[in-house]
Curated annotation (Swiss-Prot):
InterPro entries associated with the record: SMAP, SMAP_dom
Signal peptide from the UniProt entry: none
Keywords from the UniProt entry: Acetylation, Isopeptide bond, Phosphoprotein, Ubl conjugation
Annotated stretches, region: Disordered: 1-183
Highest taxon listed in the record's lineage: Eukaryota
Protein name: Small acidic protein
Covalent cross-link Glycyl lysine isopeptide (Lys-Gly) (interchain with G-Cter in SUMO2), where: 13, 62, 75
Family note: Belongs to the SMAP family.
Recorded name of the encoding gene: SMAP
Phosphoserine modifications at: 15, 17, 63, 87, 127, 147
Ranges annotated as biased composition (Acidic residues): 106-149
Modification N6-acetyllysine occurs at: 174, 179
Biased composition (Basic and acidic residues): 48-78, 153-171
Amino acid sequence: MSAARESHPHGVKRSASPDDDLGSSNWEAADLGNEERKQKFLRLMGAGKKEHTGRLVIGDHKSTSHFRTGEEDKKINEELESQYQQSMDSKLSGRYRRHCGLGFSEVEDHDGEGDVAGDDDDNDDDSPDPESPDDSESDSESEKEESAEELQAAEHPDEVEDPKNKKDAKSNYKMMFVKSSGS
């Protein structure tokens, strides 16, 4: 151990050239075989620079390097606009969100009474509904009662004159409203 200290005295700077007796840090002199293996070793050690491997460079392909004409731009924009409008129309109409909770299904009357709950199945064409489902729930109860009375009057004009039937229609409507909104 004293021999190693004598060859490198304390406080003296070493020269820039590596010493021959420090073979463990001199990996450049190691015989790795051909140049390819040496490059692989350098790459694995993190010392080698990556070379271009021949893969496609972004923006350097002739199929993607052409520019669209004005007509193509207009056509693409029109298609995107129509798709956007279709999705917004279906979202705002609430056609796909008609369920009110678990186990709830709309009552469909086929015997000619119509929808007492005020659900318009006549407007199932492609035009969007002017009100969203949230807006229709915010209507006052008196307005809904009036609309139910008008529906009953239009469907059964002879029965509306009887006050007992009118009260029954109101109570039926209130019951349907309570069932559909309270889950």
